[in-house]
């Protein structure tokens, strides 16, 4: 079947893409702003793209009005983030962190999550304590 992508709505294009690439790993990205506020947000446009050097990628879309998301702003300002993988036990909390809260709202608190400082002393971003077994400081 041939899809003329330029004729599809943005929503239909998204649905086509997300139903084509399966299974879909979700990067649960934790960042910290320069003032120390922690942000957690899930990204389903995520994958590993290289083993040597180890590289992961995820796509950060914008907000409806063209505003940048906190995750992107924090990464640009600090250069640091931690990728956690979502598992079945944390799926509900992940959905809560997907809500478009105002910047002042602590997603971790809303989702009942806790965090621990990264084991990499050069990295200030946090990893989720009750996430999956995989956390990658970047």
Identify the residue ranges that each predicted region occupies.
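Active-site-proximal mixed secondary-structure blocks
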Residues: 1-39, 47-138
